[in-house]
Structure formats: structure tokens, C-alpha cells
Curated annotation (Swiss-Prot):
Predominant cellular place of this UniProt entry's protein: mitochondrion
One of the GO BP terms on file: electron transport coupled proton transport
Function: Core subunit of the mitochondrial membrane respiratory chain NADH dehydrogenase (Complex I) that is believed to belong to the minimal assembly required for catalysis. Complex I functions in the transfer of electrons from NADH to the respiratory chain. The immediate electron acceptor for the enzyme is believed to be ubiquinone.
Subcellular location: Mitochondrion inner membrane
Family the entry assigns: Belongs to the complex I subunit 5 family.
Name assigned to this protein: NADH-ubiquinone oxidoreductase chain 5
GO CC annotation: mitochondrial inner membrane
Matches recorded under Pfam families: NADH5_C, Proton_antipo_M, Proton_antipo_N
Membrane protein topology class: Multi-pass membrane protein
UniProt keyword annotation of GTP-binding present: no
């Protein structure tokens, strides 16, 4: 009990330290360097969260912190409670460590921004809402964190609001996430009606309807940018590079996967939902890996690699291995944040140049950035004994030894091979060869705010996977025996991708005509955005115009409305007037005939 109290106290203290910078203007009258103060608070919060992690590693005890009762609706009660279990205790220190590096990098990258203090506040709120989402013990609190990361992503992606592309990307992100939120709210409504509780313990004790589970999958599809709701993720690169690093490493994009991991006790018994999750993730990881190969923007390549890894996490959830998916979230956070920080360093040093075709030879001028970029790319490939190896290798082993869909297995292995191709492409174009940029670019790595966070994340990339896998008890079934070729499958696939990447990169030095159809398909992202963003509005506007002209104008106005009434009256008046010819003899004759008939009948 004493161990649990110490762990809970440290966890609450780390959250309080995150709130202090947000209240700084209300509590302090002294003028200090606010961005530096925020960075120091994040560092202290990380240090404060380490005892909870160490105690959990030593004792393995989980707890639920219930602070106060919020409100009641008849017999429906909602309390403020935090669930400190395996997932939240491990994830919070990793998120704090990565955010600490990103905030320190932002001191260098955003130093000339006039609103840098507001920028740091937004980043801290972004992190805080993600921690609320991870540690929530009920759906209402989880929904607050869920919506919080969505709102903060909108504000941070559109940070440079003077650029129309940034505003469009921010709107695109929030609109795609609204679709996912519909699924989440559908599940919440079903649980309120059928379970009469939003507490996770009560939810896990009942059987959920497939419609409610499908709502969770839709929510994860929108938030984690799975296929069909994926275009917002590469567009989010219009925001500042620190935003991209935080967004892709440990906050918003992994929130959808974390939601499925949290609700996995409900998913594991429904094979249909697991199959949907498996196939959706496999399709996402292949499509985005193919798109990454044809991109020339360094941030877009890293963004598509994130989407591909999210698809791999979704595949792992579909394999009924949630702890492996969580392990990949943790290892992925280190090298993905480092890749974005290295990209930001290169972009900043090359006067905001993002095209990898205009780079080259940076290994000699930016050695620390280049070494970290190469380390992160190798970890992304799944190179042995780096962070990505411990999770990707286990995922592919679990997939090869499970009774799963061979179609999903095949395209996931192809996507893993493509990962090596686009990772090698970044290394080849940016670090090797001759410089292809202007010679007057002020290249330097003299600022410690640039070097220190990259070095810390590089150390995490090298050692985090080993530390996580050796100190945490395995919470999933391990395949003890397997054929040698299955054990070596991940390494063979990665090696094949490396060889293909080297061959493709060597072809760029030769004058060869490319296949325009394949090139256009992948460069235009499968024409998905053109179809969904242009065809649907075109169809809506066309149908609206046709309905307005055919139904309202032609039918109502011309047949039943004023014009129709005018036509009826004009025909009636013409009929009456046509009977009046103006012939006096005819009138007298009709009068005479009428008089004769009257006399005869009377």
C-alpha cells in the first residue's frame, strides 16, 4: 500500500507540474524567460514520473486514483479518476521525455517567433490532454482528452495562420477527426443506454454490441489516420516542425491506437472486428509506404512513414497482441521525434528548403544531425538492436506464427520492405553525394538547444527498446519455437528492401524514362484527395443545382406556383373570350332561340 501511495503521489505531482506553466501569468508577477521555464517544468515532471515507473517495474502494482465526484444524472455517476496501470505508467515518462526534447529544440527553432510563449503553452496543453486521455478511467474523461488533442492539433497545425496552406491543413485535420468523433460518441451513447456507466471496470464486465465496437474502430481510424481518413496526416506538415514531432511521436496520432488497446478486452472476443482492424491496418501500411517512396519533401516522407507505422500498430491490434502494439508506440516515439528534429535542423540550416533533391553532402557539414538521422532511419527499418527492432521483429514473428489472413500478412511484409526503401532514400539524398544547395547557406550546429535534444533522443533510440523489453514482464504469449526462416523473416524482408533501395537510388544517376502512370498514381497519393475533396463537392453542388432548378424552379414555379396559376387563368380566359365572337346576328339568333324554348316549355 505504501508503494502505491508513493507512486500515485509522484504521478499526480508530475501532472501538477505541467499545469503550473499554464497558470504562470496568474501566479507570478516577475518577468522571466517563459519558454525556458516551460522546458524546465517538463524536465522536472519527467524526473518526477520516473519513481512511479521504477516502482512499477519493481512491484508491478497497478492502482486507480479517484479524486472527486463530478456529477450524477439519476443513477448515472461520473467521477474524476485516473487509471495508473501498465499502459499509463510506462507511456507518461516516455511522452514527457520526448516533449522535453521537443521543447528544448523549439527554443532554437522558434526563437524568432513573436508568440513563442503562446506556442509553448499550446504544446504543454497538447501533452496534458494526451496524458488525460492515457490515464482516464472513464469514457467522459477520456473524451475530454480525445477532444483536447484534436483542438490543440487544429491550433498548432494552423500556427502560421498567414499561410493559406496551413489554414487548409488545420481545417482538414479537424474535419477528418470529426468523422472519427461520431464513432466515439456513438459508442458512448450505446454504453450509456445499455451499461448505465462509463467506468472502464463496468464496461469490461459486459459484452459490447458490434455496432459499439465499430464506433471505436471508426474513432481510431480518424484519429490515427488509417486508410480512408488518412489525408490529413501529410497535410499536417504545414505546421512548425516541433508540432510535427510532438504530433507524430507521442500525442495525437497514437491516440486512436491507444483507444483500441485500452478497449482490447472488448475486441478480443469479436473475430469480425479483429479482422476489420487487421485488414484496415495492412491496407494503410502498404498504401502509405508506397506513397512515401515517391515523395520529395523530407517532412512528407517522415509523415507517411508515421502513417505506415500506425498501420502496423493497427495490424498488431488485429492480431490480438495489444501489448506488442503498445511496445511499438513506445519505441516509435523516440526515433520518430528524432527524425522530425533532424529534418527541422536540416530545413532551418538550408533556409527553409524541404526538397531532398536540393540537399546532399550534409554528412560533412552537419555531422551530429546526419548521424542521428541515419540512426533514426535504421531504427525505422528495424535494424537489429535499435529501438524499432524489438517491436517490429516481434510483430512480424507474431504475424507469421498466428492463424491470420495471408493477404494481410503478405502486404504487411511488402510494406516492411518498402520501409527500408524510403528510409535509405532519405539517407542517400540528404546525407550522401555532392551538395546540391546554395553555397552561402549558414550551416552550423553550435547551439546546445539544437544538439542536446537530438543526442538524448538518439540515446533513447539506441537503448530504449532493450530497456523496455528486458525490464517489463511480457504480458503477451511468446512463441517459444518457430522455424528458422520465420525467425529471420523480418531481417530478410528489410535486407531485400535495402537492396532494392540501393538499386533504385543508383538509377537516379542514369537517364531513364520512368513509368508515368505508376509515378503519377503514387505522387498524387492514389488520387484519393482529388476524388474525395473534389468529386464529392462537385456531386453535391451539381445535385443541389439540379434539385433547385428541376424540382423547385420547373415543377413548383412553372406548374404549381405563380407561373402555373397564370397559365391556368390565361387558358380559362382565352376559352371564355373565344366564345365571344362579336357577331350581332348570332347574338339576336341565340336570343330568339332562347325565347322560343322558354315559351314552349312554359
Amino acid at each position: 500500500m505504501k508503494v502505491i501511495n508513493i507512486s500515485n503521489t509522484m504521478s499526480i505531482m508530475s501532472i501538477i507540474l505541467l499545469i503550473l506553466p499554464l497558470l504562470y501569468n496568474l501566479l507570478s508577477l516577475k518577468k522571466i524567460n517563459f519558454p525556458l521555464y516551460c522546458k524546465n517544468m517538463i524536465m522536472l515532471a519527467f524526473m518526477m514520473s520516473l519513481p512511479s515507473l521504477l516502482l512499477f517495474m519493481y512491484k508491478g502494482q497497478e492502482s486507480i486514483i479517484t479524486n472527486w465526484h463530478w456529477f450524477s444524472i439519476h443513477s448515472f455517476n461520473i467521477s474524476m479518476s485516473f487509471k495508473m496501470d501498465f499502459f499509463s505508467i510506462i507511456f507518461i515518462p516516455i511522452a514527457l521525455f520526448v516533449t522535453w526534447a521537443i521543447l528544448e529544440f523549439s527554443l532554437w527553432y522558434m526563437h524568432s517567433d513573436p508568440n513563442i510563449s503562446q506556442f509553448f503553452k499550446y504544446l504543454i496543453i497538447f501533452l496534458l490532454t494526451m496524458i488525460i486521455l492515457v490515464s482516464a478511467n472513464n469514457l467522459f474523461q477520456l473524451f475530454i482528452g480525445w477532444e483536447g488533442v484534436g483542438i490543440m492539433s487544429f491550433l498548432l497545425i494552423g500556427w502560421w495562420y498567414g499561410r493559406s496552406d496551413a489554414n487548409t491543413a488545420a481545417l482538414q485535420a479537424i474535419l477528418y477527426n470529426r468523422i472519427g468523433d461520431i464513432g466515439f460518441m456513438l459508442t458512448m451513447a450505446w454504453l450509456m443506454l445499455n451499461c448505465n456507466s462509463w467506468d472502464l471496470q463496468h464496461i469490461f464486465s459486459m459484452n459490447m454490441h458490434p455496432i459499439a465496437l465499430l464506433g471505436l474502430i471508426i474513432a481510431a481510424t480518424g484519429k490515427s489516420a488509417q486508410f480512408s481518413l488518412h489525408p490529413w496526416l501529410p497535410s499536417a506538415m504545414e505546421g512548425p516542425t516541433p508540432v510535427s514531432a510532438l504530433l507524430h511521436s507521442s500525442t495525437m496520432v497514437v491516440a486512436g491506437i491507444f483507444l483500441l488497446i485500452r478497449f482490447h478486452p472488448m475486441l478480443e472476443n469479436n473475430k469480425t472486428m479483429l479482422t476489420i482492424t487487421l485488414c484496415l491496418g495492412a491496407l494503410t501500411t502498404l498504401f502509405t509506404a508506397m506513397c512515401a517512396i515517391m515523395q520529395n519533401d523530407i517532412k512528407k516522407i517522415v509523415a507517411f512513414s508515421t502513417s505506415s507505422q500506425l498501420g502496423l500498430m493497427m495490424v498488431t491490434v488485429g492480431l490480438n497482441q495489444p501489448h506488442l502494439a503498445f511496445l511499438h508506440i513506445c519505441t516509435h516515439a523516440f526515433f520518430k521525434a528524432m527524425l522530425f528534429l533532424c529534418s527541422g535542423s536540416i530545413i532551418h540550416n538550408l533556409n527553409d528548403e524541404q526538397d531532398i533533391r536540393k540537399m546532399g553532402g550534409l554528412f560533412y557539414t552537419l555531422p551530429i544531425t546526419s548521424s542521428a538521422l541515419m540512426t533514426g532511419s535504421l531504427a525505422l527499418m528495424g535494424t537489429p538492436f535499435l529501438a524499432g527492432f524489438y517491436s517490429k521483429d516481434s510483430i512480424i514473428e507474431a504475424m507469421n506464427t498466428s492463424y491470420t489472413n495471408s493477404w494481410a500478412l503478405t502486404i504487411t511484409l511488402i510494406a516492411t520492405s518498402l520501409t527500408a526503401i524510403y528510409s535509405l532514400r532519405i539517407i542517400y539524398y540528404t546525407l550522401l553525394g555532392h551538395p546540391r544547395f546554395m553555397t552561402m547557406s549558414p550551416l552550423n550546429e553550435n547551439n546546445p538547444n539544437l544538439i542536446n535534444p537530438i543526442i538524448r533522443l538518439a540515446l533513447g533510440t539506441i537503448f530504449a527498446g532493450f530497456m523496455l523489453t528486458t525490464n517489463m514482464p511480457p504480458s503477451y504469449s511468446i512463441t517459444m519455437t518457430m522455424p528458422m526462416f520465420i525467425k529471420q523473416m523480418a531481417l530478410m524482408v528489410t535486407t531485400t528492401g535495402l537492396m532494392m533501395g540501393m538499386e533504385l537510388n543508383s538509377l537516379t544517376n542514369k537517364l531513364m524514362k520512368s513509368n508515368n502512370h505508376t509515378n503519377n498514381f503514387l505522387t498524387m497519393l492514389g488520387f484519393y484527395t482529388q476524388i474525395m475533396h473534389r468529386m464529392q463537392p462537385l456531386i453535391s453542388l451539381f445535385m443541389g443545382q439540379r434539385i433547385a432548378t428541376m424540382l423547385i424552379d420547373m415543377n413548383w414555379y412553372e406548374k404549381a406556383g405563380p407561373k402555373g396559376q397564370a397559365n391556368v387563368h390565361s387558358k380559362l380566359s382565352s376559352l371564355i373570350s373565344s366564345s365571344q365572337k362579336g357577331l350581332m346576328k348570332m347574338y339576336f339568333l341565340s336570343f330568339l332561340v332562347s325565347m322560343i324554348f322558354i315559351i314552349l316549355f312554359t
